[in-house]
Amino acid sequence: MRIISINIGMNNFAAITNNIGKEPNLIRGKTLKAENQWYNKITQPLRQQLKQAYDIEQREKLSYNINKLAKQTIEHIFEYFWSVSEWIITYCIENRIDTLLIGQYKMLVRKDYVTIPYGYFYSLLETKCAYHNIKFVRVNERYTSGTSFFDGEPPTKEFYNKERRIYKHLWKCNNGECVNADVNDSYQIMRKVYPQLFDNGVEGYLKDPKVIDIKIGRDKGDVKK
């Protein structure tokens, strides 16, 4: 069985680990943040005007412009999701991966941001996996972010202690060594589904990730007018 395990987030959109002895990969999520920040910056004055507008025609025009900007932002996010899913599927094919595990991300909603359609990404990736005969498994992430993979801890309540996450993206192992927290979470997703893989310990599972930047839309200077 050749497996990749994916932890989904925002700053790091995808932390991808494996059981084939290769380094983890971190796909950065700065594109998602940039899209939302751009949307918020551009629409904030429009939303303020909308609150103060009493003329029906003016309100309709402002609402139309806000919705148009939201649609443009979502289109860029869809483009990013497509590019990320292509990268993941290509990686799977090149490394003969037959099973893809992915944590079910808890989406945080902010009123001033476009809601990121994570569900679309999951469906897109699942469809591509089915086409290439790759098993696709969604995994409940409970206890994966507060337990330590490299200390041999199962992702259970008994071992859960999130205080060891000393910084947003750093996890402190029991011996004092720090590893990438998203990589730790990704490995724990794998352990949750296939604990037998680690009966003989975690030697051979690499810690240091390779960072992947996937740029689209405004990242490449392609700003729609």
State what each model feature region is.
Residues M1-K225:
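Positively charged, helix-rich recognition surfaces that bind polyanionic ligands
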